[in-house]
Amino acid sequence: MRSVRAYVGLGANLGDPAATLEAGIAALAALPGVRLRGVSRLYATRPVGIRAQPDFRNAVVALDVPAGPDPTTGAIALLVALKGLERAFGRRTRERWGPRELDLDLLVFGRARLAVERPPEGVSLDRGKADRLLVVPHRDAAERLFVLAPLADLAPGLAPPGWGHTVDWARRRREAVEGPEAVRAIATWNAATRAWTPL
């Protein structure tokens, strides 16, 4: 089966978010045909949009996933799996930028550049978010330090399609805007124990 390298962002700020991300990574690795290839450091990050909520924990994973017969089919299949996992972890429809039990975002899917309609089982769980398109690379990733910092841990030299620059360049640019205190690495992934090791 042909595979493609995908990058998925994870975030949570309800309950024990670090433990939730550990369980989320295990669930991603257990998806059919998926191989876990890398896990970023764990970051403590300030909320975006709605400030009156707990800080988030964010990470990014590198996955080899089934490519599908074409990039659109492969990306949609992964999206549907991600949304299914969100629901399995208790994610409910909430306001956009609000608290999350578990948030899984498809950031990059190989060299694909897509803007396709989401199937019903792949729609966003953000209340009031009218966008029904799956956009790959993720349309907001280049402007979110909480995505760029962990993504740069895994693929600093990656230039996602349409960006015109590398992940590390985008990370440094956003850090200059948001300040280095906006995201803080707090743990590394221990592949042997499949858990975070505090820094």
Short names for language-model regions:
Residues 48-56, 76-199:
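Flexible, gly/pro- and Lys/Arg-enriched active-site loops
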